[in-house]
């Protein structure tokens, strides 16, 4: 089952009463033995009590699969044999994670908001600790991101949320 998080960011500092109404063409995606990919269409509108602010709105959409703990191993050659030499337990890594934005990610969300809402792919992965003898524990989380990104399971889709008339938006996300 996928969970959906939608962050709505306005590029103005004025406080307004706004809400977001969203819909998806699929509420659930069944992963079965015959699953060969799917596409999720997300659409919505910004409901306002006042006229739209000046300036462009920014929208960030995240779609995440269930998080699960995983063990990440580092292989090294020991006496001519490749073997697992280090292991780090990653507490929670989503099985699928996609971030779609209405413009460039760095101009859509700042570091404080990213830290607070855990929007970016590295922040969506929770790795609390590692054995004391592993000095580069962050590289294990990086390996999870690298491997799952190569498989299409982690996606950063910049400029993929279309906004019409500062009110309607839509995006489409491919699941491998």
Question: Where do the PLM segments sit?
Answer:
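Sec-dependent N-terminal signal peptides
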Residues: 2-13
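N-terminal edge beta-strand
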Residues: 18-34, 152-154
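Short solvent-exposed capping/turn motifs at the termini of beta-strands
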Residues: 46-49, 175
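A short beta-turn/strand-edge loop motif at beta-sheet boundaries
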Residues: 50-55
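Beta-strand signatures of extracellular beta-sandwich domains
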Residues: 60-62
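Short aromatic-acidic-glycine turn motif
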Residues: 65-74
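Membrane-proximal low-complexity regions enriched in glycine and acidic/polar residues
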Residues: 75-175
């Amino acid at each position: 089952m996928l969970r959906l998080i939608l962050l709505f960011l306005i590029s103005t500092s004025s406080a307004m009463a706004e809400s977001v109404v969203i819909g998806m063409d699929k509420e659930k995606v069944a992963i079965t033995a015959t699953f060969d990919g799917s596409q999720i269409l997300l659409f919505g509108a910004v409901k306002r009590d006042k006229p739209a602010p000046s300036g462009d709105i920014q929208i960030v959409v995240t779609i995440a699969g269930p998080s699960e703990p995983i063990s990440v191993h580092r292989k090294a050659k020991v006496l001519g044999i490749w073997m697992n030499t280090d292991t780090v337990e990653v507490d929670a890594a989503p099985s699928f994670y996609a971030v779609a934005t209405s413009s460039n990610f760095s101009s859509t969300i700042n570091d404080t908001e990213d830290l607070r809402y855990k929007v970016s792919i590295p922040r969506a992965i929770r790795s609390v600790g590692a054995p004391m003898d592993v000095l580069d524990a962050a590289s294990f989380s990086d390996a999870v991101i690298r491997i799952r990104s190569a498989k299409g399971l982690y996606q950063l889709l910049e400029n993929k949320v279309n906004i019409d008339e500062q009110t309607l938006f839509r995006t489409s996300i491919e699941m491998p």
